[in-house]
From Swiss-Prot:
Protein name: F-box only protein 32
UniProt short sequence motif Bipartite nuclear localization signal, positions renumbered to this chain: 280-295
Subcellular location field: Cytoplasm; Nucleus
Keywords from the UniProt entry: Cytoplasm, Nucleus, Ubl conjugation pathway
UniProt cross-references to InterPro entries, sorted A to Z: F-box-like_dom_sf (IPR036047), FBX25/32 (IPR040394)
One GO location term (cellular component): cytosol
Gene (name only): Fbxo32
Function according to Swiss-Prot or TrEMBL: Substrate recognition component of a SCF (SKP1-CUL1-F-box protein) E3 ubiquitin-protein ligase complex which mediates the ubiquitination and subsequent proteasomal degradation of target proteins. Probably recognizes and binds to phosphorylated target proteins during skeletal muscle atrophy. Recognizes TERF1.
GO biological process: cellular response to dexamethasone stimulus; protein ubiquitination; response to denervation involved in regulation of muscle adaptation
Sequence motif: Nuclear export signal, positions: 169-173
Pathway entry: Protein modification; protein ubiquitination
Organism ancestry: Eukaryota, Metazoa, Chordata, Craniata, Vertebrata
Amino acid sequence: MPFLGQDWRSPGQSWVKTADGWKRFLDEKSGSFVSDLSSYCNKEVYSKENLFSSLNYDVAAKKRKKDIQNSKTKTQYFHQEKWIYVHKGSTKERHGYCTLGEAFNRLDFSTAILDSRRFNYVVRLLELIAKSQLTSLSGIAQKNFMNILEKVVLKVLEDQQNIRLIRELLQTLYTSLCTLVQRVGKSVLVGNINMWVYRMETILHWQQQLNSIQISRPAFKGLTITDLPVCLQLNIMQRLSDGRDLVSLGQAAPDLHVLSEDRLLWKRLCQYHFSERQIRKRLILSDKGQLDWKKMYFKLVRCYPRREQYGVTLQLCKHCHILSWKGTDHPCTANNPESCSVSLSPQDFINLFKF
């Protein structure tokens, strides 16, 4: 008679009926028997009730230990591998499908924010999730989302960089949560409503911290951007991809203000982000009858999405359907794995899990 033990993966136990009742068969070769509860229970009080109570005690002890560990941990859900297999349907070998929440948990976003080449990519992905995909995440993925966001805010407060970028991210998330919290009873958010109200208060506190940042001058006295030749100053400005950064840089010094109004600088910025067809539809002339490229840029930004470019992105292998960070290895059987990899923008990453 087979008996299934506590571990469902075990082959079970062999029991044999004797004159004294059912006994567990210990060794097939020796033919010896062993009493299941003889080590801690007398034979007279042996019963099914004792067996079930011991099993329930073990399960309860394991559950209490797990609850204590979960209550003490505030870190991100950890997974050893830095890649994930993306499957969208069930097969004989693999059942189910990969979700956005699973990918968000298993990919190394917590470490990625520490890399300046991947920071903007992760922030843009967080913004897209906050806009429309927050309800598609599981409970652990939503908790993971808030933990990563907290690390991003702490990093910005420490480095005093990318302040405006994180302000916009927090405002987007707060606006989305205000809409979702009002829809109580429709199962749009995982968890208690009071927990999400507390998280919204935390977001407001982060916004206050970012607004109160006072950028201090560096202690060392060396060359500044105003001490450089004009050609180098223009070269630095041409590497800025956001027109708002050009405006802010022009407000730092009178000499930089003159350079920030350069028509050729704004023309190249428009041509970098937008196509010729888009530019022709939004032509604006100045009082002198010339194209006002600065006004055209801000007009185009309101009408069309800007070009996105990141140092390091996520990539999908077309051969083995594995998603990983660019530059990291993954188990691939292709002869040339690099030729099979396709870079994904943050929006492409989200679209990958839309079924």
